[in-house]
Amino acid sequence: MKKNLFVEAVLPGSDLRKLTEEEMEEYRRPFRVPEHRLPTLKWPREIPIDGDPDDVADIVSDYADWLAVSDIPKLFIDADPGAILIGVQRQFCRTWPNQTEIKVSGSHFIQEDSPYEIGKAVSEWLQNLK
């Protein structure tokens, strides 16, 4: 937490483009005080990997099962090359009904790699909802 590794290393290492100093300052702003960085330590530990932690893995699994049968409109923003949602997971998402898919350039924090394309896609998708 002392080094603010999530903001200083994980974030810039997970984008295709180099964030500007102004952008980095915005990410740093809420975490200037080391004690305020606790969420950046806790949250990654809650990401389910190989079924652990089980409570979170169960929630994710139940939600994925629901999305696979729900007719609720969905917008799938596929990132190329992507980072986490690739391979089998990407293919699974593509099977969901009533879904629009777009492709943008991006790795993990895709809003930083393709902000305008994502904003335009979300706006158009929302306008086309019936």
Q: Over which residues does each language-model region extend?
A:
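Helix-rich cap/lid subdomain of alpha/beta-hydrolase
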Residues: M1-I47, D54
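Active-site donor-binding loop signature of nucleotide-sugar glycosyltransferases
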Residues: R29, A79, V104-G106
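Alpha-helical elements of Rossmann-like donor-binding domains used by nucleotide-donor carbohydrate transfer enzymes
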Residues: A9, E26, K42, D62, ...
